[in-house]
């Protein structure tokens, strides 16, 4: 007797799965997105459950029928002879997918199917199966599409990628069946049969190495677990199942060489060994803590297969280029005669390898579309895009510009006791980056390219930028931090992009300031406001100084070092704590200064304090949930300035600044106050190329305008 089946898989593996299933005896009737339909006898079904390395679920199709309405779904499920699938004493769960005009909720759909099953058994013998949503013995799938309901029984009860050996995983785990697909695309079974070795230099929790060992040693993945739902199937033949399990165990064979996994993280290596032990392949593999640049082959021939980091968070992709360049160099230099298969979602990182791929395959790591690049490592596969490769004509122009800027600005910065400054700001339009120096680090902020620029050109320029900057500026590649700068809205202005807690201390005049180059779009210090901060460093002792929207209060540090008494207001607790750290770093007594966590607009409305100098530097736009209202600086600057002026002593000064490039000051403010545009006086040497970086105004009461 043959049974109808649907075997699901990860997106992109359909035809690879078809080949595997045919080899296991399935008569394939249709290949569809994310799965294969076919017919099989009971022995073939058991072999599919034991041997498939690519499948997610193996579903026995029970029935299908027209079911546009709730009553029709219930009737179909009531009429089916469920006793041919399981008995009433089993626990069940329903997974429902799809919708119709009447059934728009999957929970509702599952309820209808469950009710139909329960009603059938009650009518049959007065008893009913219980529901267990966590770990049912019988899992039923119901799919409703185009008013056709298809119902099937999950023969295994869980996704087959859950082999059972991986109790814990690393930060970016690779599904076991996707790892198997990588190995099959790289022709690992054929290479293993020829005695090839294998090395994963980014092994993490060991999935690729373990799957490779299971393939090479002919270990059926289904042997690792004995909790398949098929044991509760009414037509299950336990003697046949045990016979096929025994035959699978007899096919296991030893390996001529150990397969190797290495990783720079020692903790994850311990986890990899534990996973290998649970998979029963620990004697076949070797896991070591080793950085990439120390990796060397243990055999003359082999396969390097890996899933290196490919940076899906903001700024990470380009930051990983040096790692991929190192991988390409290591492969080319040390692994001649080997094959390689490398998975990445980024074409930029693939190009950074500098090696030509023989073939590319599309795979999906979860929802993420990736490419598997298969390479032959030989002398004929020349290494390109290395950090020391010859520069293109355009890249040479960039090098010359950076070198010129460096020679000029380094002397100026040293003379003024400045260790952080902007050295480049899209001086050459085709290289649309801003580059800021922080001690011996360089932060590259990539402006989002316009849609008119082809992707491959933008990628080429990114690689050239990373090739040129270390040479021209004398910066170690590992000290390049790359972010993408774009027009920011609301909370994006201080968007967190990671968590490293890596802080760096920089110098600006007499002040020492803390910056974080990794975790946020901004570093904690707005370089374009340097001259304003240095102006506050000249305040008279005892000056009452208010810093509204204070951020990390770097301006207040300068004022406090001059002897001013500062009040610092910001909505962010994170930045206020950072501000306090800045004060402590400079040995400033915190008891003489205030750090207030408030919505600045609301605080200015209610406070009765008076100040001699106020620095008002709000974001261009903010819609933080903690604010009482949306802040739009073009719309709201009049009310903000009026509130700030109310807090000034009669002879006080307000400095209002904004980075909104198209900002226009409301003319009526000039009628009410003495307003002076001091923007040119606040643009330092490193921002002369971009004089519209901000607008700054000095505002006083009219009768003090001449003072």
UniProtKB/Swiss-Prot annotation:
Record field: catalytic activity: guanosine(2445) in 23S rRNA + S-adenosyl-L-methionine = N(2)-methylguanosine(2445) in 23S rRNA + S-adenosyl-L-homocysteine + H(+); guanosine(2069) in 23S rRNA + S-adenosyl-L-methionine = N(2)-methylguanosine(2069) in 23S rRNA + S-adenosyl-L-homocysteine + H(+)
Ranges for domain THUMP: 44-155
GO molecular function terms noted in the UniProt entry: 23S rRNA (guanine(2445)-N(2))-methyltransferase activity; RNA binding; rRNA (guanine-N7-)-methyltransferase activity
GO CC annotation: cytoplasm
Protein name: Ribosomal RNA large subunit methyltransferase K/L
Top-level taxon: Bacteria
Assigned EC number: 2.1.1.173, 2.1.1.264
Cross-referenced InterPro entries: 23SrRNA_methyltr_KL, DNA_methylase_N6_adenine_CS, RlmKL-like_Mtase, RlmKL-like_Mtase_CS, RlmL_1st, SAM-dep_methyl-trfase, SAM-dependent_MTases_sf, THUMP_dom
Cellular compartment(s): Cytoplasm
Signal peptide range in chain numbering: none
Protein function: Specifically methylates the guanine in position 2445 (m2G2445) and the guanine in position 2069 (m7G2069) of 23S rRNA.
CDD domains xref list: AdoMet_MTases, THUMP_AdoMetMT
Organism per entry: Legionella pneumophila (strain Paris)
Pfam families: Methyltrans_SAM, RlmL_1st, THUMP, UPF0020
């Amino acid at each position: 007797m043959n049974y109808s089946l649907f075997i699901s898989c990860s997106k992109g593996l359909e035809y690879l799965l078809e080949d595997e299933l045919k080899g296991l005896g399935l008569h394939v009737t249709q290949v569809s997105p994310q799965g294969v339909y076919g017919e099989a006898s009971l022995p073939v079904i058991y072999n599919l459950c034991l041997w498939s390395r690519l499948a997610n679920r193996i579903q026995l199709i029970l029935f299908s029928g027209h079911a546009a309405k709730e009553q029709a779904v219930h009737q179909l499920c009531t009429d089916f002879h469920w006793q041919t699938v399981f008995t009433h004493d089993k626990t069940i769960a329903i997974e429902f997918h799809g919708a119709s005009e009447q059934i728009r909720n999957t929970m509702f759909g599952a309820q209808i199917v469950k009710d139909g099953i329960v009603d059938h058994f009650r009518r049959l013998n007065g008893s009913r199966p219980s529901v267990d949503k966590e770990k049912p013995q019988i899992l039923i799938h119901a799919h409703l599409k185009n008013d056709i309901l298809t119902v099937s029984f999950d023969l295994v009860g869980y996704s087959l990628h859950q082999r059972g050996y991986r109790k814990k995983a690393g930060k970016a785990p690779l599904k076991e069946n996707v790892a198997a697909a990588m190995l099959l695309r790289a022709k690992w079974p054929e290479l293993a049969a020829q005695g090839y070795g294998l090395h994963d230099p980014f092994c993490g929790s060991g999935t690729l190495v373990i799957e490779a060992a299971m393939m090479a040693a002919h270990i059926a993945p289904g042997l690792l677990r004995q909790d398949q739902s098929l044991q509760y199937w009414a037509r299950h033949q336990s003697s046949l199942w045990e016979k096929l399990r025994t035959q699978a165990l007899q096919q296991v064979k030893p390996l001529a060489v150990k397969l190797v996994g290495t990783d720079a993280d020692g903790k994850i290596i311990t986890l990899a060994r534990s996973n290998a032990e649970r998979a029963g392949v620990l004697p076949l593999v070797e896991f070591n803590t080793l950085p990439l640049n120390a990796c060397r082959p243990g055999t003359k021939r082999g396969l390097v297969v890996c899933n290196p980091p490919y940076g899906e968070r903001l700024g990470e992709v380009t930051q990983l280029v040096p790692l991929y360049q190192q991988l390409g160099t290591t492969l080319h230099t040390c692994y001649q005669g080997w094959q390689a298969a490398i998975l990445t979602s980024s074409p930029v990182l693939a190009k950074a390898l500098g090696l030509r791929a023989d073939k590319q395959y599309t795979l999906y790591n979860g929802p993420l579309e990736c490419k598997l690049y298969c390479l032959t490592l030989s002398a004929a596969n020349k290494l390109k895009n290395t950090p020391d490769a010859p520069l293109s004509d355009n890249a040479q122009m960039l090098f010359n510009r950076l070198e010129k800027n460096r020679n000029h600005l380094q002397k100026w910065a040293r003379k003024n006791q400045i260790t952080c400054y902007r050295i480049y700001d899209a001086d050459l339009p085709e290289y649309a980056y801003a580059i800021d120096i922080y001690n011996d680090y360089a932060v590259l902020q990539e402006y989002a390219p316009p849609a008119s620029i082809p992707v491959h050109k933008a990628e080429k320029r990114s690689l050239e930028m990373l090739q040129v900057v270390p040479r021209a500026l004398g910066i170690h590649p590992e000290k390049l931090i790359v972010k993408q700068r774009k027009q920011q809205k609301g909370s994006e202005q201080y968007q967190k992009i990671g968590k490293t807690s890596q802080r760096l201390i920089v110098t600006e005049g007499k002040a020492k300031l803390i910056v974080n180059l990794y975790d946020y779009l901004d570093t904690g210090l707005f370089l374009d406001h340097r001259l304003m901060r240095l102006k506050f460093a000249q305040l008279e002792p005892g000056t009452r100084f208010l810093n509204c929207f204070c951020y990390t209060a770097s301006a207040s540090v300068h004022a406090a070092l001059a002897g001013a008494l500062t009040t610092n207001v910001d909505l962010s607790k994170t930045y206020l704590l950072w501000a306090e750290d800045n004060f402590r770093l400079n040995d400033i007594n915190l008891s003489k200064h205030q750090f207030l966590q408030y919505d600045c607009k609301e605080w200015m409305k209610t406070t009765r304090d008076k100040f001699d100098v106020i620095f008002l530097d709000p974001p261009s736009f903010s819609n933080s949930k903690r604010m009482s209202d949306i802040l739009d600086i073009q719309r709201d600057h009049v009310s903000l300035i009026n509130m700030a002026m109310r807090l000034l002593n009669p002879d006080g000064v307000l400095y209002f600044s904004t980075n909104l490039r198209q900002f226009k000051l409301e003319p009526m403010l000039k009628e009410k106050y003495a307003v002076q545009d001091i923007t040119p006086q606040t643009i330092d040497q490193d921002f002369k190329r971009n004089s519209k970086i901000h607008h700054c105004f000095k505002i006083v009461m009219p009768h003090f305008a001449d003072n």
